[in-house]
Amino acid sequence: MIKRAAAAAIGGALAVAAVPAVLGAVGFTGAGIAASSLAAKMMSAAAVANGGGVAAGSLVATLQSVGAAGLSTSSNILLGSIGSAFGALLGGAKRASPSPPPGGPRPEGEQPGENVPQVEPPKSPLGPEKHEK
């Protein structure tokens, strides 16, 4: 239970901290859009598509706002909650135990070939083959 709670706390913290880091790496910084970045290319494409300006409420405008001012408190709470849920899910997931290797140890009483049926190979319906010289 403590492992799951720790994973939830880590997941929430990572989710909240990752947003500004990722936006900064893409080019949406506190000082504006970084030159020659992916954000600059996105803004250029949005401006060309809209006839010279970036529309308010568009993806580029929203990301620029978040990059400059950060997320609101309610957005951080929501993001932290989602990150905590994923962290708890991943932290509480049980891994399947690996199966023993084919030549590895066997349970007591089980010998190789013990449970394998002994069947004769099928006989040819044409009878024995004759090779002529």
Swiss-Prot record:
* Ranges where the record places region Disordered: 93-133
Membrane topology listed for this record? Multi-pass membrane protein
| Domain of life the protein comes from | Eukaryota
Is Nucleus set as a keyword in this record?
A: no
Q: Which organism is it from?
A: Bos taurus
**What does this protein do, in the record's words?**
Plays a role in the apoptotic process and has a pro-apoptotic activity.
Q: Which keywords, in A-to-Z order, does the entry hold?
A: Apoptosis, Membrane, Mitochondrion, Transmembrane, Transmembrane helix
* Main location per the UniProt record: mitochondrion
Q: Where in the cell is it found?
A: Mitochondrion membrane
Per the record, the GO terms for biological process are: apoptotic process; intrinsic apoptotic signaling pathway
Protein's UniProt name? Interferon alpha-inducible protein 27-like protein 2
Does the keyword Transmembrane helix belong to this entry?
yes
Provide the GO MF annotations for this entry. Answer: molecular adaptor activity
Q: Which family does it belong to?
A: Belongs to the IFI6/IFI27 family.
- Cite the PANTHER family for this sequence: INTERFERON ALPHA-INDUCIBLE PROTEIN 27, INTERFERON ALPHA-INDUCIBLE PROTEIN 27, MITOCHONDRIAL
Q: Name one GO cellular component term.
A: mitochondrial membrane
Q: Where are the transmembrane segments?
A: 8-28, 51-71, 73-93
